[in-house]
Amino acid sequence: DDDMPIEEALSGPVFREQPEITWKYLLQIEQACRGAVPNLAHAILARWSAEAWPPAELWVLTQNVDGLHSAAGSRHLIEIHGDLHRLRCTQCDWRARVDDYRRLPALPPCQNCGALLRPEVVLFEEMLPPAATQALAKQLSRGFDLVFSIGTSSQFPYIVQPVVLAKQQ
């Protein structure tokens, strides 16, 4: 067995040097998420965003990589750690959505160039995606009327920032 902590196995450096270890854990995470459907909380947030009057701009900032907020229909979504079901090539621009990893080989190759695929998720020791951080920065600069912090330990500064900002307003 690989005999390393999960935080190391799911890190950028290990993915680059020993992708089979990282993919082993990614497959386990995907299996745990497989078949999951949005719950009532996901549905309420998505519906609130769609039906609020006057029209509200409800933003969801999630650390989850399960894609459930998107599946529920949330319109304004910042998936700060990515989505496990979006795969991208490590060499070219090829991307695809894969909802079930069971058909993937242990080290899935790109259909375009044959290089290794990876999910569009933030591994440990990797930078957050620029598009997500820019979207969050834009919302932080606009401020908030109301912030709900649901289901998070708020261990990362970028997760607690909206709460702190709303408290200061």
Functional labels for PLM-detected ranges:
Residues D1-Q169:
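Conserved catalytic core of sirtuin-type NAD+-dependent deacylases
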